[in-house]
């Protein structure tokens, strides 16, 4: 019985390690990026004006990904959800966030995790907009809330 429990624990550990590696999809190469020296383009699966991104690793159309994202000053994403979990770290300006619990201003160095399916509003600071790093655990999407 004790040996079986150890085997189950080892199997679960291996599955967890594989899953984390798969979600991050970064392989074994070091990734370095400077937001001042990347090319920003229209963000896949998002409104075409006011938001741009630079993919650092992964593919936002296929699965897990890491990007630099910019919101124009005053940009409004409206109320929406994402299918996958999203992690955000502020770099410059402020990513504005709102949900039923209240409002947050995600500035340089601040961290925010938005679980997949969680209804929220987001936008850019009215004067500076926002530059932030985003990781998504799956294909990136922006689903307008009903």
Model-flagged regions — what are they?
Residues 77-79, 96-98, 119-126:
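Short beta-strand His + acidic residue motifs that chelate non-heme Fe in jelly-roll/DSBH
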Residues 16-18, 23-65, 146:
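A short, N-terminal "cap"/entry segment at the start of jelly-roll beta-barrel domains
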Residues 62-82, 115-117:
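Conserved short histidine dyad/triad with adjacent acidic residue
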Residues 72-75, 82-100:
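Glycine- and acidic-residue-biased ligand/ion/polar-headgroup-sensing regions
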Residues 1-4:
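Positively charged n-region of N-terminal signal peptides that target proteins for export
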Residues 100-117:
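Short acidic-glycine-tyrosine-enriched beta hairpin
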């Amino acid at each position: 019985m004790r040996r079986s429990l150890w085997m189950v624990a080892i199997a679960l550990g291996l599955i967890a390690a594989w899953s984390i590696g798969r979600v991050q999809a970064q392989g074994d190469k070091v990734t370095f990026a400077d937001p001042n020296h990347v090319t920003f383009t229209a963000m896949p699966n998002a409104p075409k004006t006011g938001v741009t991104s630079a993919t650092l690793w992964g593919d936002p159309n296929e699965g897990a990904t890491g990007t630099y994202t910019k919101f124009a000053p005053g940009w409004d994403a409206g109320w929406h959800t994402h299918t996958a979990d999203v992690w955000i770290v502020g770099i410059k300006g402020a990513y504005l966030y709102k949900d039923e619990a209240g409002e947050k201003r995600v500035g340089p160095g601040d961290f925010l995790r938005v679980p997949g399916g969680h209804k929220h509003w987001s936008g850019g600071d009215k004067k500076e907009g926002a530059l932030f790093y985003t990781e998504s655990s799956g294909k990136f999407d922006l689903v307008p809330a009903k």
